[in-house]
């Protein structure tokens, strides 16, 4: 049995009520995860792991999140649940899986939770989504909202840009936050807004806010793990790079290629030998 396949000691799983109870307390630590090995590494350090629809761009090479399917989210949700033992795991509802009606949203969210075993789902929550959140929350689906810059709506909203910079836009984001919290979401992701707006929302709503490009005024922070680790050449303004994984991986692969070509790999340390005869 490999070291990777050994089951870690079972820890108590963080729940939606646990996250909600952290309002105003120690900041929530959240990252994205798309597979079991990375989830296993992140799990001891995180309160929440999000299987984001960003998987479409980060893992599958899509240009946006719009092409992500429910089956893709379920597949990656299952993988993350195999690696995470302690953090709450939330799965994004992809574009087109919840907008038609509350009934459609509930049916698809129930399928995600049943087939992955995750503890919550997340939807992008304009004010139009309040009835959907309320419908799901009343039927025991823990929901995280997502306001401000909403990637699934980027094509309609004019691209990936910060929100709330005009008075009208600012009020729209506040209205989204109030509607999302009132409808029953247990936490709200705020993306791409100025610090003063994030602070106002955080001080107004009674559920934790989780910022991504929304300053330290929020109740917690989330980043795309690959952005934080330096996997890509381009880094968003709001990301702090904690590593340069692309550069280190490139160097490691270059060394492997060199070792193969000069036949220094495999060496005798990496080669099986026949057992000596007992006779």
Curated annotation (Swiss-Prot):
Catalytic-site annotation from UniProt: 191
Annotated binding of 3-methyl-2-oxobutanoate, by residue: 53-54, 92, 122
Keyword vocabulary terms for this entry: Cytoplasm, Magnesium, Metal-binding, Pantothenate biosynthesis, Transferase
Class of this enzyme: transferase
Biological processes, Gene Ontology terms: pantothenate biosynthetic process
Subcellular location per the Swiss-Prot or TrEMBL entry: Cytoplasm
Co-factor binding comment: Binds 1 Mg(2+) ion per subunit.
Gene Ontology cellular component list: cytoplasm
Enzyme Commission code: 2.1.2.11
Catalysed reaction, written as an equation: 3-methyl-2-oxobutanoate + (6R)-5,10-methylene-5,6,7,8-tetrahydrofolate + H2O = 2-dehydropantoate + (6S)-5,6,7,8-tetrahydrofolate
Pathway field: Cofactor biosynthesis; (R)-pantothenate biosynthesis; (R)-pantoate from 3-methyl-2-oxobutanoate: step 1/2
GO molecular function terms listed in the Swiss-Prot or TrEMBL record: 3-methyl-2-oxobutanoate hydroxymethyltransferase activity; magnesium ion binding
Cofactors: Mg(2+)
Function per UniProt: Catalyzes the reversible reaction in which hydroxymethyl group from 5,10-methylenetetrahydrofolate is transferred onto alpha-ketoisovalerate to form ketopantoate.
NCBIfam families, per the entry: panB, PRK00311.1
Annotated family: Belongs to the PanB family.
Known partners and oligomeric status: Homodecamer; pentamer of dimers.
Name this protein carries in UniProt: 3-methyl-2-oxobutanoate hydroxymethyltransferase
Protein's organism: Maricaulis maris (strain MCS10)
Taxonomic lineage: Bacteria, Pseudomonadati, Pseudomonadota, Alphaproteobacteria, Maricaulales
Gene: panB
């Amino acid at each position: 049995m490999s070291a990777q396949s050994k089951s870690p000691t079972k820890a108590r799983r963080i729940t939606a009520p646990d996250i909600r109870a952290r309002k105003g307390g120690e900041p929530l630590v959240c990252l994205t995860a798309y597979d079991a090995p990375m989830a296993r590494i992140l799990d001891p350090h995180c309160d929440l792991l999000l299987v984001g629809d960003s998987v479409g761009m980060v893992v599958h090479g899509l240009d946006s999140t719009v092409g992500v399917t429910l089956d893709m989210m379920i597949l990656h949700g299952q993988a993350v649940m195999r690696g995470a033992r302690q953090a709450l795991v939330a799965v994004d509802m992809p574009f087109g899986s919840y907008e038609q009606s509350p009934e459609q949203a509930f049916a698809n969210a129930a399928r995600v939770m049943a087939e992955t075993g995750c503890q919550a789902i997340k939807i992008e929550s304009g004010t139009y989504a309040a009835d959907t959140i309320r419908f799901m929350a009343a039927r025991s689906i823990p929901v995280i909202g997502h306001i401000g810059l909403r990637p699934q709506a980027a094509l309609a909203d004019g691209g990936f840009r910060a929100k709330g910079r005009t008075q009208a836009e600012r009020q729209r984001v506040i209205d989204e936050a109030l509607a999302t919290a009132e409808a029953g979401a247990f936490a709200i992701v705020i993306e791409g807004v100025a610090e003063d707006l994030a602070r106002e929302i955080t001080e107004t709503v009674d559920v934790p806010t989780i910022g991504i490009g929304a300053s330290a005024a929020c109740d917690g922070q989330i980043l795309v793990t690959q952005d934080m680790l330096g996997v890509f050449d381009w880094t968003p303004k709001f990301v702090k790079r904690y590593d340069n994984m692309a550069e280190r991986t490139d160097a490691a692969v270059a060394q492997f290629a060199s070792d193969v070509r000069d036949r220094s790999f495999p060496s005798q340390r990496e080669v099986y030998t026949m057992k000596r005869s007992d006779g």
